[in-house]
C-alpha cells in the first residue's frame, strides 16, 4: 500500500468516465465535496494480496494517527493508481478500500471516491508541516522481487521487533523553545528557522528514499576521498589515501576526547550468535536491520553497534560503586546495518560504517542524568572541534511522557544550551529500551537529515545482560546505562563537512575542510624548475603536511588545482622569494571566491600559524608522495 495524506481545506471530485474495472456506484457517489478533511490518496499493491486484512489494519492505523495530529474528523479515501507501478488486482483493491472505509466510519465522517473511474478533482492543501505526508505499508512475511510477491523464496530479512514498533509507535511531535515552551508544530512559526523546518518535514514524513545524489558524492570523488565499491555490497565504500587519512584523524580525535573524559578503550567481536538468549532479546529492542551469516551451523549476525560486546564484558566484570560512572569506548570498524537499498547514498547512509560507541554504567538515575548533561556538552564540543557548529545542525529530543514530567528542567536546558528551538518526539508508552535520547541532526543540501552525536538513557540492558555492581553495603545492584556516540558515525562527519562546504559555496564562500583535517595543509608551487630546490628548503621548515607541485604545468594551472583540492595554504616560489627569504602565501580561509587573500611572510611565521590552528588535534603524516609528479590518480 502506498499512501499520500493531504490535510486539505477542501477536496472535491466528479466522475467522468468509467474504466473496464470500474465498480458500480449510486448516482450520489458520482461527485462529492468534503471540507476541512484529511485526504488519503491510496494505491493497493500486489504485495498486499498476501494479507489484505493486515493492510487494512495498518492503513487505518496510519490514517487515524495523522487525523489525530491534524485534528480533523473528516476523511476522504481516494484511489490513486499513479502512486505505484505494481498494483494489486482490482478485486483486492476494492476489498481493501471498502475495508478501510468500514473501519474508519465509526469514528469519522468518511467519504470514498469510487474505484476504476476517471475523475476530475480539486484539492487545496493547507501547507503546514503535517499537511503532506507519505507512507509505504507492507504486510509482514512478504518479499518484493521483480515487482511480484514471492513467499518464502528468499532468505527472510532479519528485522527487529523494535524496528516494527518504530513504524507503528504513536508519538507526538512538538517544538521546544529555549524558554521552555512546548508548542504544537502547527502553532509554531518555523519561517525564521528554515533548516528546522526541513528537519521537521523529514522526520514526520519518514521518507528516506534517495531521489538524487547529494553534492558530497561528487566532492568525495573529486577530492579523491572515497568512492563506491562495485565489487562489494551496496553501502560498503572504498577509501583512498586522503579519505583514509581524514577518517583516521577523526577516529583518533574522538578516542582521545573519550579517553580524557574517562573512558577505557576496548575491542570486541564483530559477529554474535543470533540465538544467544540475552542477545536475541536485545536484537528485538534495537531498531535496526541486521546482516546474518551462518557459521558452524549457527546463525550469526554482524553487530550494528558495540553494545553487545561491551555489555557481555560488563557482565563478566567485578564492579564496585567506587568505579562508577564506569565508561568504555570502542571505535567499531565496522558496524553493519542492512539499510534499505533505496536509502543508500554516498557517505550519508551506509551498510558498513565506523562508529565511536561509548557506554557508561551509572549508580542510579540521578548519576545517569548528571552524566547525560555532561555528555550532551561533550558532544557539542566534539562537533565544534570537527568543524560542525551548533548553527549547522538541528537537535531532536525524544522521551517518554513520564520521564518528561519528572525531568522538565533537564530537557528544557538542552534547548537553552543550544539557544534555538528543537524538535521533540514524545511517546505515551515506552516502546524501546531508552527513556530519553537526543541526536544532533545535520540537514544537507537536499533537505535530508542525518543523525550525528547521540546520547541515550537505557533502563533495560543492565537487567537483560545481568550487569551489576557492589554498592556501599556490599550488595549487588543494577546500574543505569548510557549509550553515547560523541560524533556519530565517522563517515557521516565527513559527509556533513562536505555538504556544509557545498552549501557555503552556493552562498558565495570559499569551501574548505578544517586545517587539521586537510590532507595537504600547505602546497608549495615553484614557478619553474629552478625554484624547486628552494621549495624543498621551505618544506623542511614546516611541521605539517606539505607537498610540492613539481609537475611541468603552468603556474596558473597549478594554483587552480590547489584551489580545487581545497588546500588551506598555497605558497608560490619565484625569484623574489629566493632573494629575500619570504614566501607568497594564499590563505584560503580568508579568501573570497574571486578575491584570494595573499600575504608575504616568512616560512617560520607560516609554521607558527599552522601549529596554532592544529594545536590539540591528532596529526598524521602526508599519506602520498610529497611530490605531485610521483602520485597516481585514483579517480
UniProtKB/Swiss-Prot annotation:
GO terms for biological process: threonyl-tRNA aminoacylation. InterPro entries: aa-tRNA-synt_IIb, aa-tRNA-synth_II, aa-tRNA-synth_II/BPL/LPL, Anticodon-bd, Anticodon-bd_dom_sf, DTD-like_sf, Thr-tRNA-ligase_IIa, Threonyl-tRNA_syn_edit_dom_arc. It catalyses: tRNA(Thr) + L-threonine + ATP = L-threonyl-tRNA(Thr) + AMP + diphosphate + H(+). Keywords: Aminoacyl-tRNA synthetase, ATP-binding, Cytoplasm, Ligase, Metal-binding, Nucleotide-binding, Protein biosynthesis, RNA-binding, tRNA-binding, Zinc. Its main location: cytoplasm. Its cofactor is Zn(2+). PROSITE patterns: AA_TRNA_LIGASE_II. Residues 1-144 are annotated as: Editing domain. The N-terminal domain is an archaea-specific tRNA-editing domain that hydrolyzes incorrectly charged L-seryl-tRNA(Thr). Catalysis of tRNA editing is performed by the charged tRNA itself. Catalyzes the attachment of threonine to tRNA(Thr) in a two-step reaction: L-threonine is first activated by ATP to form Thr-AMP and then transferred to the acceptor end of tRNA(Thr). Also edits incorrectly charged L-seryl-tRNA(Thr). HAMAP family: Thr_tRNA_synth (MF_00184). This is Threonine--tRNA ligase. It comes from Methanosarcina barkeri (strain Fusaro / DSM 804).
Amino acid at each position: 500500500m502506498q499512501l499520500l495524506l493531504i490535510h486539505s481545506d477542501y477536496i472535491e471530485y466528479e466522475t467522468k468516465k468509467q474504466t473496464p474495472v470500474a465498480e458500480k456506484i449510486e448516482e450520489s457517489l458520482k461527485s462529492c465535496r468534503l471540507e476541512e478533511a484529511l485526504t488519503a490518496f491510496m494505491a493497493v499493491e500486489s504485495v498486499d494480496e498476501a494479507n489484505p486484512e493486515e493492510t487494512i489494519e495498518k492503513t487505518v492505523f496510519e490514517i487515524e494517527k495523522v487525523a489525530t495530529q491534524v485534528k480533523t474528523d473528516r476523511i476522504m479515501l481516494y484511489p490513486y493508481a499513479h502512486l505505484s507501478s505494481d498494483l494489486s488486482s482490482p478485486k483486492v483493491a476494492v476489498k481493501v478500500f471498502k475495508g478501510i472505509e468500514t473501519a474508519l466510519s465509526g469514528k469519522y465522517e468518511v467519504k470514498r471516491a469510487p474505484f476504476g473511474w476517471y475523475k476530475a478533482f480539486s484539492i487545496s492543501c493547507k501547507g503546514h508541516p503535517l499537511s503532506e505526508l507519505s507512507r509505504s505499508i507492507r504486510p509482514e512475511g512478504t518479499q518484493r522481487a521483480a515487482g511480484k510477491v514471492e513467499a518464502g523464496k528468499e532468505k527472510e530479512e532479519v528485522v527487529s521487533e523494535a524496528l516494527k514498533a518504530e513504524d507503528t509507535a504513536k508519538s507526538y511531535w512538538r517544538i521546544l523553545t529555549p524558554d521552555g515552551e512546548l508548542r504544537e508544530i502547527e502553532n509554531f512559526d518555523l519561517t525564521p528557522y528554515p533548516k528546522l523546518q526541513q528537519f521537521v518535514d523529514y522526520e514526520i514524513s519518514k521518507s528516506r528514499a534517495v531521489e538524487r545524489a547529494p553534492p558530497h558524492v561528487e566532492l568525495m570523488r573529486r577530492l579523491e576521498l572515497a568512492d563506491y565499491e562495485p565489487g562489494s555490497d551496496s553501502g560498503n565504500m572504498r577509501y583512498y589515501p586522503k579519505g583514509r587519512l581524514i577518517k583516521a584523524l577523526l577516529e583518533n580525535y574522538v578516542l582521545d576526547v573519550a579517553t580524557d573524559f574517562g573512558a577505557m578503550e576496548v575491542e570486541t567481536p564483530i559477529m554474535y550468535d543470533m540465538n544467544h538468549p540475552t542477545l536475541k532479546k536485545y536484537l528485538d529492542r534495537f531498531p535496526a536491520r541486521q546482516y546474518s551469516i551462518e557459521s558452524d551451523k549457527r546463525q550469526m549476525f554482524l553487530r550494528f553497534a558495540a553494545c553487545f560486546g561491551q555489555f557481555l564484558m560488563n557482565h563478566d566484570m567485578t564492579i564496585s560503586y567506587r568505579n562508577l560512572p564506569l565508561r568504555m569506548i570502542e571505535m567499531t570498524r565496522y558496524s553493519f546495518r542492512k539499510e534499505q537499498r533505496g536509502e543508500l547514498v554516498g557517505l550519508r547512509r551506509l551498510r558498513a560504517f565506523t562508529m565511536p560507541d561509548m557506554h557508561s554504567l551509572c549508580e542510579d538515575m540521578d548519576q545517569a542524568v548528571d552524566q547525560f548533561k555532561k555528555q550532551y556538552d561533550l558532544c557539542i564540543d566534539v562537533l565544534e572541534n570537527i568543524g560542525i557548529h551548533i548553527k549547522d545542525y538541528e537537535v531532536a529530543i525524544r522521551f517518554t511522557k513520564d520521564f518528561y514530567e519528572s525531568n522538565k528542567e533537564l530537557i528544557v536546558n538542552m534547548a537553552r544550551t543550544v539557544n534555538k528551538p528543537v524538535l521533540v518526539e514524545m511517546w505515551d508508552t515506552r516502546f524501546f529500551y531508552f527513556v530519553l535520547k537526543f541526536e544532533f541532526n545535520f540537514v544537507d543540501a537536499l533537505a535530508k537529515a542525518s543523525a550525528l552525536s547521540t546520547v541515550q538513557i537505557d533502563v533495560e540492558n543492565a537487567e537483560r545482560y545481568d550487569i551489576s555492581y557492589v554498592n556501599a553495603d556490599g550488595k549487588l545492584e543494577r546500574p543505569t546505562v548510557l549509550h553515547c556516540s560523541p560524533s556519530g558515525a565517522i563517515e557521516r562527519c565527513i559527509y556533513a563537512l562536505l555538504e556544509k562546504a557545498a552549501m557555503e559555496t552556493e552562498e558565495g564562500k570559499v569551501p574548505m575542510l578544517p586545517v587539521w583535517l586537510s590532507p595537504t595543509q600547505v602546497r608549495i608551487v615553484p614557478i619553474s624548475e629552478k625554484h624547486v630546490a628552494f621549495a624543498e628548503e621551505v618544506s623542511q621548515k614546516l611541521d605539517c603536511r606539505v607537498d610540492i607541485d613539481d609537475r611541468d604545468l603552468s603556474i596558473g594551472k597549478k594554483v587552480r588545482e590547489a584551489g580545487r583540492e581545497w588546500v588551506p595554504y598555497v605558497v608560490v616560489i619565484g625569484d623574489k622569494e629566493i632573494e629575500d627569504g619570504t614566501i607568497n602565501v594564499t590563505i584560503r580561509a580568508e579568501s573570497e571566491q574571486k578575491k584570494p587573500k595573499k600575504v608575504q611572510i616568512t616560512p617560520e611565521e607560516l609554521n607558527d600559524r599552522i601549529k596554532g590552528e592544529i594545536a590539540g588535534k591528532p596529526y598524521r603524516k602526508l599519506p602520498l608522495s610529497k611530490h605531485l609528479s610521483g602520485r597516481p590518480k585514483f579517480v
